[in-house]
Amino acid sequence: MYTGRFAPSPTGLLHIGSLLTAVASYADARAHGGKWLIRMEDLDPPREMPGAASHILHTLEAFGFEWDGEVAYQSRRYALYEETLCRLKTAGLVYPCHCSRKDWQAGARRGADGFVYNGRCRHPGQRPALQGKQPAWRIRVPDRIIGFSDGIVGGYAQNLARDIGDFVLLRADGYWAYQLAVVADDAEQGVTHIVRGQDLLVSTPRQIYLQQCLDVPTPQYAHLPLLTNAQGQKWSKQTLAPALDLNRREQLLRQVFRYLKLPEAPETDRPAELLDWAVAHWDMDKVPKHAVTAP
């Protein structure tokens, strides 16, 4: 059975880009007769906005979304992540990293998603002294291509050794890294389809590699076009994207429908009816492959 999900982070309030992802993931799930889950990705408490999680849920309800089951909170799932890391330790796939970011980034080359880790701590004899600090934990990556067929973008691939390097699963400050948490959650929740923004496309080969290491199914992925402002920047909390105005729910839904190339919806003042209409007319093949300007 199709199981999709929407996984916001409570570092801020929902904005127009969030709404596009919510609509697309919801419409794709419901159009396939599937489930749509909500998962709150609250992995980084220092960056979270107080009250954002409850505000996000209230906003989704106000826009007519109905999800299946209880909301999952990553902050309550640490035991699952610890179990997942233990499996990788047992398989000999991970190692402690004693490097500070400043140390390992000095002289490092840039890859697909920031600097490529140079593998300094792969070999025990080369690891610097801990000096009383906890290590991060990294996973060894293979020198081979990992690719997949995306439902919107098409073919996408990376050589993890060349483009990414061994990446962190547990940070030195004790917080779980996104890549491990999302793979563990998707597997445990039975997620079969992931519809999300293209800013996460670069993360997908890492997640597929983790799925292979853990012998869990790889979901089908579809990465949506990013919404950009007039300066070509992705609308996000960092670019001061305005929070969704609950007094303009119908207008904002229609705006998102246009970005997703849905036909014009009939007049109604009920957001839930607009969502039902989007489900009935959903066509992933019409979704643009490239960024869309949303002034």
UniProtKB/Swiss-Prot annotation:
The lineage of its organism: Bacteria, Pseudomonadati, Pseudomonadota, Betaproteobacteria, Neisseriales. It is an enzyme of class 6 (ligase). Zn(2+) binds at residues 97, 99, 117, 121. Its EC number is 6.1.1.-. The keyword Metal-binding applies. PANTHER family: GLUTAMATE--TRNA LIGASE, GLUTAMYL-Q TRNA(ASP) SYNTHETASE. Binds 1 zinc ion per subunit. GO terms for biological process: glutamyl-tRNA aminoacylation; tRNA modification. It comes from Neisseria meningitidis serogroup B (strain ATCC BAA-335 / MC58). GO terms for molecular function: ATP binding; glutamate-tRNA ligase activity; zinc ion binding. This is Glutamyl-Q tRNA(Asp) synthetase. Keywords: Aminoacyl-tRNA synthetase, ATP-binding, Ligase, Metal-binding, Nucleotide-binding, Zinc. A motif ('HIGH' region) lies at residues 8-18. Pfam families: tRNA-synt_1c (PF00749). NCBIfam families: PRK05710.1-3, queuosine_YadB. ATP binds at residue 237. Catalyzes the tRNA-independent activation of glutamate in presence of ATP and the subsequent transfer of glutamate onto a tRNA(Asp). Glutamate is transferred on the 2-amino-5-(4,5-dihydroxy-2-cyclopenten-1-yl) moiety of the queuosine in the wobble position of the QUC anticodon. InterPro entries: Glu-Q_tRNA(Asp)_Synthase, Glu/Gln-tRNA-synth, Glu/Gln-tRNA-synth_Ib_cat-dom, GluQ/Sye, Rossmann-like_a/b/a_fold. The keyword Zinc applies. L-glutamate binds at residues 5-9, 41, 178, 196. Belongs to the class-I aminoacyl-tRNA synthetase family. GluQ subfamily. One of its GO terms (cellular component) is cytosol. A motif ('KMSKS' region) lies at residues 234-238. Its cofactor is Zn(2+).
